[in-house]
């Protein structure tokens, strides 16, 4: 067994069969030993958080300013490669927000990346539509779903809330400042080609205009 110098210990957790784990510190690094003094995790981490605080049976660890997770056997379940890892279930059930190279994504409860960290901003699920979250990259916006798929491509410079002008529709604008609508299936129901769009009336029509002409769009 490796000898550990300058050890400080803090009771962490008890297994179902009664085994206790302790945080140990050596040369400003943290690890875990069991009650027999055997290393479960060698002291190599800058920080070890309490087990079960973020994820059942896991502890968040920090290694050279990057974060990951280990389990109670000392196994690395999520490599310490993220700049930050948020709390589970904060955005979506069973997901935790991650940040890598300045970009955002999500991991699930098994530690798998269900949404790769490629986004500059991520919104809350349900803010625009049920099971959708807004995402943004390089100033362009779209939506992902709770299964991790992109339902609206990131091609709009702005997306208004649904139902603001017409029920179940959201006004969108592209990088050329052209306007159109998407519906709650993610379909572009009115092409993004207009310079202005006025509100729908009780007759379910709206005036839309380009630089050359004005037309009337009809809501089904």
Regions found by a protein language model. Give the residues of each.
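Bacterial Sec-dependent N-terminal signal peptides
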Residues: 1-21
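Residue-level detector of conserved, function-critical positions
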Residues: 19-220
């Amino acid at each position: 067994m490796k000898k550990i110098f300058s050890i400080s210990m803090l009771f962490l957790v008890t297994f179902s069969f009664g085994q206790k784990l302790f945080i140990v510190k050596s040369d400003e690094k943290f690890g875990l030993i069991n009650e027999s003094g055997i290393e479960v995790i060698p002291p190599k981490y800058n920080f070890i958080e309490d087990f079960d605080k973020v994820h059942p049976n896991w502890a968040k660890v920090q290694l050279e300013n990057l974060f990951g997770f280990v389990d109670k056997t000392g196994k690395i379940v999520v490599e310490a490669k993220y700049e930050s890892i948020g709390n589970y279930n904060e955005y979506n059930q069973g997901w935790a927000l991650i940040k890598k190279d300045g970009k955002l994504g999500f991991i699930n409860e098994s530690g798998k990346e269900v949404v790769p960290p490629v986004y500059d901003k991520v919104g809350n699920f349900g803010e625009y539509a049920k099971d959708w979250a807004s995402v943004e990259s390089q100033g362009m916006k779209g939506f992902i779903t709770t299964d991790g798929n992109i339902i609206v491509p990131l091609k709009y410079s702005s997306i208004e809330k649904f139902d603001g002008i017409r029920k179940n529709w959201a006004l969108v604008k592209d990088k050329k400042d052209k306007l159109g609508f998407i519906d709650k299936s993610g379909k572009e129901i009115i092409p993004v080609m207009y310079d202005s769009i006025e509100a729908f009336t009780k007759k379910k029509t709206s005036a839309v205009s380009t630089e050359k002409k004005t037309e009337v769009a009809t809501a089904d």
